[in-house]
Amino acid sequence: MLNKEVNSRVFDILVVTTKWIKREDLFNAISLSNHSDNRKKYLDPLIDLGWISMEYPERRTHPNQKYKITEPGINLLKLISKP
């Protein structure tokens, strides 16, 4: 089970990625520093679960990499958005 901080960050990331967004802009939008530790803790697991997709999946660190929510991510967002 996700702890509250991670769950809150997951929700925020899913909301912010409804359109393609660069990592720096994504982390700024959710008040996190654009640091590799935050990528590893919050973004990479969502990619691995298939909830977020990468514009350049063959290169995780592509200089123009952008992220967007996937259909399974949208379904999860709908589930966790309900009161």
Residue ranges of each PLM-predicted region?
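C-terminal regulatory or interaction extensions
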Residues: 1-83
